[in-house]
Amino acid sequence: MPKSNHSTAPLPFPILIGDIGGTNARFSILTDAYAEPKQFPNVRTADFATIDEAIQKGVLDKTAVQPRSAILAVAGPINDDEIPLTNCAWVVRPKTMIEGLGIEDVLVVNDFEAQALAIAALSDENRERIGSATGDMVASRVVLGPGTGLGVGGLVHAQHTWIPVPGEGGHIDLGPRSKRDYEIFPHIETIEGRVSAEQILCGRGLVNLYNAICVVDGIQPTMKDPADITSHALDGSDKVAVETVSLFATYLGRVAGDMAMVFMARGGVYLSGGISQKIIPALKKPEFRQAFEDKAPHSALLRTIPTYVVTHPLAALAGLSSYARMPANFGVSTEGRRWRR
């Protein structure tokens, strides 16, 4: 009977690695510690009733390699033997996977733990620097990912070990500071009366911010898709879209600076996800770094902390692969999150 336990033993190879998002799931297989991961085509979560079916048809039916273990990154709380995902209908049931897919060892981690693992050793070709600060590369870091929501994860460096720290940093309060903020914030859609960072710093948050600006300026909104807003902002064809993305970058800078101070992230703050990649030109304008550094009495500290956009196309899989190869380099807690035959 499969059981949940705490184990420091390495996962046995071959290892199935999965990054499970709300819309797409990405999988690879790592055959040994020295091999390059074998990538599989992205799987649309809506195309399969269960994650087990997606793994069987999207991975196992396409390879002769039978994984002995699996490490899966999911968006959702990992509190029991059934793990519902936040943004799709799948439920991860490790015991069922072990019984039905021939896998003997399953580890489930938070999606932003995987992103945090990825930023431990990103090369320059997989990141775009924002601003001129270079920082101390062997030091604690933090990653923020505006996407379906706002994910936040820390990566603490201590005793020659990288320790990923998952959390719910995307739900911290975000309040107005400038005169323009005080005009706009009363029109931001709230959750139970409060504006969290995620109410602005994600895809739907971008639309939320755009609509609030339209209300303040007495303009009828014409866009409902975050991609439309960003594209019109970047080409300068819509003034409300331009201001929306400019303020988005400002507010992202404020939150990123806060997280840098929480984690003393001298090794850098990393922005992950498709939104960050798409708005790199806006992030390179002064607003983002100005907001990031505007943290009196610690502005001098913030000026030394580098900021990057993660450009690696499969960052979470890369982070999980790094852990799978060399688990001793990372302080990943497996208690209550690892199931073995």
From Swiss-Prot:
Q: What is its main location?
A: cytoplasm
Question: Per the record, what is one GO cellular component?
Answer: cytosol
Keyword rRNA-binding assigned to the entry: answer is no
Q: Which Pfam families match?
A: Glucokinase
Residue spans crossing the bilayer: none
Q: Where found in the cell? A: Cytoplasm
Q: Which reaction does it catalyse?
A: D-glucose + ATP = D-glucose 6-phosphate + ADP + H(+)
Sorted alphabetically, the keyword list is: ATP-binding, Cytoplasm, Glycolysis, Kinase, Nucleotide-binding, Transferase
GO molecular function terms noted in the UniProt entry: ATP binding; D-glucose binding; glucokinase activity
Decide whether keyword ATP-binding is in the record: yes
| Protein name, as recorded | Glucokinase
Which organism was this protein described from? Answer: Rhizobium etli (strain ATCC 51251 / DSM 11541 / JCM 21823 / NBRC 15573 / CFN 42)
List the taxonomic lineage.
Bacteria, Pseudomonadati, Pseudomonadota, Alphaproteobacteria, Hyphomicrobiales
